[in-house]
Amino acid sequence: MKVTFLGHAVVLIEGKKNIIIDPFISGNPVCPVKLEDLPKIDYILVTHGHGDHLGDAVEIAKKNDATVISNYEICHYLGKKGVKTHAMHIGGSYLFDFGRVKMTPAVHGSGILDGDSMIYGGNPSGFLITIEGKKIYHAGDTGLTREMELLAEENVDVAFLPIGGNFVMDVEDAVRAAVMIKPKKVVPMHYGTWELIFADVELFKKKVEEKGVECVILEPGESLEL
C-alpha cells in the first residue's frame, strides 16, 4: 500500500481501493499534480468544510463515481450537488469494503463558503483508517486536544499531524500530540502552503524524535510504503 503526501493536508492512499483525503488539488500552490494526474479514486474523505480541505471533492467524486465520507452536514451539502456520500459523525466507525473508518475529534471550524454565504458544515474531524492491516491517522485541521491520548491504544502506524500554527497546532503542540498518540511514524502536514502557516519542519523532526517518535518528512509528491 502506497501513501503519498500531495501537499497541505492532501493524502492519497493507493491499495485495493484508492482513497484521497482532503482533496485540495486545484489552487493548491504546493500540490505537484493536477486533477487529471490522479488515479481512479474510489473514496474521498473530507475532514471539514473549509475550501482548502473540501477542495475538489465534487469534481473528483463525479468523475470517478466515488463516495465521499464526511460528517452529516457536509454529506447533505454534497448530496444536493449529486455526489454519492456516506455520512458519519465523531466517534462513529464503519466497515467499508476497503477497511474501517472512525471519525475522531478535531478542534477547528467547518464552515462551507458557497458564493457570498457561509454554510454550516457540522463539526470538524480527523480520521482513523484501518486498511490492509495498517492504521493511518489523519488529524485534519486541529488544535491540541486531550482526546488524542485515546489514540495511543490504537497502535497507529502513521499519523499525519498539522504543524503550521495560526489555524492549527504549532510545532510545540504537534510534538505534544505525537507523544500522546505514540504512532510508529509521524508525518507533518499543513505547513508552508502560505507564509501564514510557515513552520520549521526540521525543528519539528528534531523535537519529536527526541521524544522517541520517528518523523518522516514527505515533500509534496513523495510516498511511503505501509
Swiss-Prot record:
It comes from the Bacteria. The keyword Signal does not apply. It holds the Pfam family Lactamase_B_2. InterPro entries: Metallo-B-lactamas, RibonucZ/Hydroxyglut_hydro, UPF0173, UPF0173_UPF0282_UlaG_hydrolase. Keywords: Hydrolase. The keyword Hydrolase applies. GO terms for molecular function: hydrolase activity. Belongs to the UPF0173 family. This is UPF0173 metal-dependent hydrolase TRQ2_1653.
